[in-house]
Amino acid sequence: MAVVSKKIPAPDKVQVKTALLSVFDKTGIVELARALSEKGVRLLSTGGTHKAIAAAGLAVTDVSEVTAFPEIMDGRVKTLHPKVHGGLLAIRDDAEHQAAMKEHGIEGIDLAVINLYPFEDVRKAGGDYPTTVENIDIGGPAMIRASAKNHAYVTTLTDPADYSELLEQLSADAGQTTYDFRKRMAAKAFARTAAYDAMIANWFAEALDIATPRHRVIGGVLREEMRYGENPHQKAAFYVTGENRPGVSTATLLQGKQLSYNNINDTDAAYELVAEFLPENGPACAIIKHANPCGVATGPSLVEAYKRALACDSVSAFGGIIALNSILDAATAEEIVKLFTEVIIAPEVTEEAKAIIARKPNLRLLSVGALPDPRVAGLTAKTVSGGLLVQNRDNALVEDMELKVVTKRAPTAQELEDMKFAFRVAKHVKSNAVVYAKDGQTAGIGAGQMSRVDSARIAAIKAEEAAKAMGLAEPLTRGSAVASEAFLPFADGLLSAIAAGATAVIQPGGSMRDQEVIDAANEHNVAMVFTGIRHFRH
């Protein structure tokens, strides 16, 4: 049975007479304390916050003087006391509460300014287990929740950005706060503690390798509100979860306008793809449009990798996202600015490249500092009506797979390299996906078709168009390897690829008609390997 409310109406305005200040982030706290003191507000504080306020020459009472109980256990216990929580939770207009306060010597607290131990920062910095645990705040969330629950009478501030609005209210209304303000701050406070607890719970789940905990909460901090979402009629915002994975959420915007919803989605897809190509194996470039690659290539230099990626589908690349696995240099920047591009993302950018990109002030340039490790899984989430689908990120790499040759002819060394390249790209193409590749360059990409045969045909058409644009006599698919991100259910998909000129095929295998497909490959002297790993992408 639910707890029954006495339904005492909340007052519109409450006089702030006593404030409790206990913060880890001391940004603006001394200035706030001084302004409150000048308005006649009694200040209570704890630990380092008390020291900072007292050092500024302000009158402040240590909470231990109020509780008559010292701070103990390295600060783990200092505010968990009835005289603190009673002062925060007491309903001022309830006679029984007032009697209890009088009997136990509890003074009301009208303002709670609290922020928390930096658990997120310690986790992000890779702190060891004991240090991370020690930075789980207990007293802070308890006080925030207590004061926010009693927002009818108590104002709760958890963000230094709200200090100025509080002071404006107090100045405009003879030291009082409005119910609307208290309610808004309470909502913000509960959102803060919810996100904080979610990060802790998720950290424990990761540490214990629990993929499906009984309760899964994905918390985030608002990074920015956007003009609109995927379409102009949709509202949107970008939240960061604190996951320590290099990418669009950790990148620095060196120039250009605010990233849009679609920019962020596409840039994330681009950077995750290019991270599959380790820098020690050479420069690589991926060009993305609508979260699908339209060209991916490696090269002896970064500028050559970009040129080769662009050549795969220069028409679709217009207005796309460019992701690089190496430092963006001047030569590559000079080529990129020749084409309209929405976003460039790279681990680093040289000063010369920055100056060149600056010629296009609307071009968004992101520097990340590192590439994400493609072998680290992490979590991905997708909302459905009334639910949340959560899974480990697809961290299966073709380099780690046991490739099984299933045809009479084994692939040549070059075909095997082309197979791996194509399968690496196919992992990042919307299903059904078919990718042709040759000599470290995509030759044609077929994405998102309901029929795998149609994806193969589209990829072949793209290859023909690219060959014509490059002035080549035959399509890029001649002598190429072809990858399918899922098994070929019938021989028709294979025959379509063979007709386009492919001589080697890589696919997961596992169809009831595998033998039919293998027989067709043998009949045409095509080499085929099974990976045993599927890469569906929806």
UniProtKB/Swiss-Prot annotation:
Matching HAMAP family: PurH
Protein name from the UniProt record: Bifunctional purine biosynthesis protein PurH
InterPro entries the record matches: AICAR_Tfase_dup_dom_sf (IPR024051), Cytidine_deaminase-like (IPR016193), MGS-like_dom (IPR011607), MGS-like_dom_sf (IPR036914), PurH-like (IPR002695)
Residues covered by the MGS-like domain: 8-158
Cysteine-cysteine disulfides: none
NCBIfam families assigned to the protein according to its UniProt record, in alphabetical order: PRK00881.1, purH
Biological process annotations from GO: 'de novo' IMP biosynthetic process
Organism per entry: Rhizobium rhizogenes (strain K84 / ATCC BAA-868)
The entry's keywords: Hydrolase, Multifunctional enzyme, Purine biosynthesis, Transferase
Free-text note regarding domains: The IMP cyclohydrolase activity resides in the N-terminal region.
Family matches, as PANTHER family: BIFUNCTIONAL PURINE BIOSYNTHESIS PROTEIN ATIC, BIFUNCTIONAL PURINE BIOSYNTHESIS PROTEIN PURH
Catalytic reaction annotation: (6R)-10-formyltetrahydrofolate + 5-amino-1-(5-phospho-beta-D-ribosyl)imidazole-4-carboxamide = 5-formamido-1-(5-phospho-D-ribosyl)imidazole-4-carboxamide + (6S)-5,6,7,8-tetrahydrofolate; IMP + H2O = 5-formamido-1-(5-phospho-D-ribosyl)imidazole-4-carboxamide
A matching Pfam family: MGS
